[in-house]
Amino acid sequence: MKNNKENSLLVEKYRPTELENYVGNEQIKDKISTYLNQNDIQNFIFYGPAGCGKTTLAKIIIGKLDCDYLYLNASDERGIETIRDKVQGFASVASFKPLKVVILDEADFLTIQAQASLRNIIETFSRTTRFIMTCNFVERIIDPLQSRCQVLKIVPPSKKDVARHLAWILNQESISFEINDLVPLVNQYYPDLRKCLNTIQLSTVDGGANDLYLRLDQSILVSSNYIDKVIKALSNKTKFNDIRQIIADSNSDDFDELFRALYDRATEYLPGKEGTVAILINEHQYKANFRIDKEINISSLISQIINNK
């Protein structure tokens, strides 16, 4: 995408840096604002679906505090060595700032041993260091950690608010668009605003003379009915390779909606074995967080469902 304005990733360019520009979660914003006025915060766990603003909120907080901070992505650094070496090392070093903050992004990837070690560090350095953890699945955070934090659910803004925000960004970038262009985009990726913005970035065309317009390539959007096709194929005892092809053709890298549909509609394709389906989905949904190729993981689930027919 070319633009006569600052050329950067839209998702970063329009990441809010002020609480008042953060969309939604008004009660949480009021609570955090009170803490920031005192230049201190509690330990927090922010949880919610991908792309709903958990990390953005954490970064707004550290941007407003007079603090030193350490940022770690726990999906990359998830072991006890990271907690002992980097987190404890940071917390134990003297600082000229009145406060230190550790952000552990995607903390639900931390091993149980790492979480247990973190619990002790939170207690040991409670006078000087605060911790902000973000996660998609709060149930994967051990209870002793949750009890030492304020656990706050970050609720995504409504589809209408997401569409309104995207329209505002497009206008700011002087990108011509039709409001109907945003409907399939929001329906496809909601509540993940990050994916919406990345798709807009890929779909913005330079018409010459700085005339920018949005042209959504339908191949970028996952077919809205591929989930129905998978369910129908399972019901009709379609061969595994044919179902695998349906999934491959969807171009999806996020199968949360398919997991949910397989659970909700188990009676349609495996009547009498809904409990077995629930167990299989639970196992593969958990494994999806640790697999590089999620298509292989979902295909494995489909194979096991077929084998239970």
Region spans (language model):
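Short conserved motifs of the RecA-like P-loop NTPase core
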Residues: 165, 176-188, 212-213, 225-226
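C-terminal helical "lid" of AAA+/P-loop NTPase domains
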Residues: 102, 183-188, 194-206, 231-232, ...
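P-loop/Walker A NTP-binding region and its immediately flanking N-terminal helices
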Residues: 1-155, 160-161, 171, 184, ...
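Helix-rich C-terminal "collar"/helical-bundle subdomain used as an assembly and partner-interaction module
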Residues: 229-309
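Short, structured loop/turn "capping" segments at alpha-beta junctions
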Residues: 175-179, 193-197, 207-214, 240-242
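Alpha-helix N-cap/N′ positions at the starts of helices
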Residues: 14, 177-180, 221-229, 238
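Loop-to-helix "switch" segment enriched in basic
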Residues: 208-235
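Conserved GTPase G-domain signal focused on the G5
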Residues: 79-81, 191-194
